[in-house]
Structures are given as C-alpha cells and as structure tokens.
C-alpha cells in the first residue's frame, strides 16, 4: 500500500494524486507509481530498477494489460504489485501446486499470476466480496486462456471455508493458499487453512509489514485504516512466529509477505 513507515503516517489524498501524476513540476511519473509504490525499499530508483530489469520484461502481456487497467481504478492501491505477482508465479511452479485458493481477489492480478503458473488441469478457488472488481479483470484472464481454472465465489470467505472444513475429503487437499483480504480475519482464516492445506503445502499472507507501520510506536500519527488494522497485523505476526504447526518466512516483497509451510 504505502512505501515506508513515514508514508504510512504522512501520505494524504493530494500527495497520492501528485504521486500518480508526477511531482507537480512537470516531471513524468515512473511506471510503478501508477498504482503506488508497493515496495518497502527506501530507494524509489532501486525499486524501479528491479521492475525494469527483472519484472516488466518478463511480465506476460495479459498481466501487463490487467495491471494497466487496474491502475485506472480508484482503489488501485489494493492490487498486488508486479514483483509480488512474479514471485507468486514462480512459487506456484516451484512447489508444483495444482489445487490452490485465493482469499481476496480485487481485479485478479495475483489470481492471474497463479492461474498462469498452474498446469492445464489446475484449479483456484477464489473468494471476494466484490464481483464487480473481479469482472473488471476477467476479460484479461479469459484472454490468457486460464478462466476455466478459476471457481469464483462472491461473498465472505469464512462460510466457504467452514463448509470445506466440514467436508473431511477437503482436508489437506490444497497445495497453496494466498490471503490478501480483511486483516481482522487473518487468524480465523489461518486456523481453517491449516486443515485444508496439505502438510508441506504453503499459505501466503499479504501485507504483513502493513506499510511499515509495524515498527511505529503506538502513539505515532497514522492514517485511519492503517491504525485500524495495524494491531491485527501485529497479532498475526506474533501468532505465526509462535505457531509450531508451520515453518515461516517473512519477506519484504510488496507490502510484506509471510509464507507458512504446514508441518503438522
């Protein structure tokens, strides 16, 4: 969402508009700033170097098109960054995932990254409360030839997960799950996903560094939504660190991604 802890406290609507359209002095915007600086790197130039050198040249045309469509959406800061999409695509291939799940879809950039990495008979159970956003990216997904892999469910994810947990045949049947949704429910999702993801499978939680606010003092000024969800993110990070059912790795990709490998 934002770049650093400083931006978490100081970014305003005019500043966001200025970031999206240049610096106010006629300087042209950098490409990644179209959807905000989704990296915790302090150097904007270094992040741009990563995108220009390793990410954009390898980005599939369908993902590029979806990224550009999403950049025009008023909620574009909700999207997965291009480097994180590349990371997820590689991760799916590395673990040989076939059956996956995504909680929180938005326009489907990370969903498309996953779908492209899955084998032809791979599947994704995708859940989001807003079908309209998903349908914004659906033409790109279909154009990429992977729409048949996606089972989209509109509505809250917890009832869907509870139904899956109630079906013993679904236990341990998923290879991978990616969560980028309501932070106040991350721990609720975690308990259910540990039943549904197979031993050795992975769960990825997005935004676990939460705009850098996780290192700010409690009395630091923050935007309202940052402050509201900050304690939930801190609680998640502490809980995952103490959970012996998983091995964890927290990475400064995008806004922070924590990978959990189920071991119990």
Swiss-Prot record:
It is an enzyme of class 2 (transferase). InterPro entries: Cation-dep_OMT (IPR050362), SAM-dependent_MTases_sf (IPR029063), SAM_O-MeTrfase (IPR002935). Residues 28-37 have a biased composition (Basic and acidic residues). Pfam families: Methyltransf_3. GO terms for molecular function: caffeoyl-CoA O-methyltransferase activity; metal ion binding; S-adenosylmethionine-dependent methyltransferase activity. GO terms for biological process: lignin biosynthetic process; methylation. Signal peptide: none annotated. Its cofactor is a divalent metal cation. S-adenosyl-L-methionine binds at residues 80, 102, 104-105, 110, 128, 157, 182. Its EC number is 2.1.1.104. Residues 1-20 have a biased composition (Low complexity). Disulfide bonds: none annotated. Keywords: Lignin biosynthesis, Metal-binding, Methyltransferase, S-adenosyl-L-methionine, Transferase. Methylates caffeoyl-CoA to feruloyl-CoA and 5-hydroxyferuloyl-CoA to sinapoyl-CoA. Plays a role in the synthesis of feruloylated polysaccharides. Involved in the reinforcement of the plant cell wall. Also involved in the responding to wounding or pathogen challenge by the increased formation of cell wall-bound ferulic acid polymers. This is Caffeoyl-CoA O-methyltransferase 2.
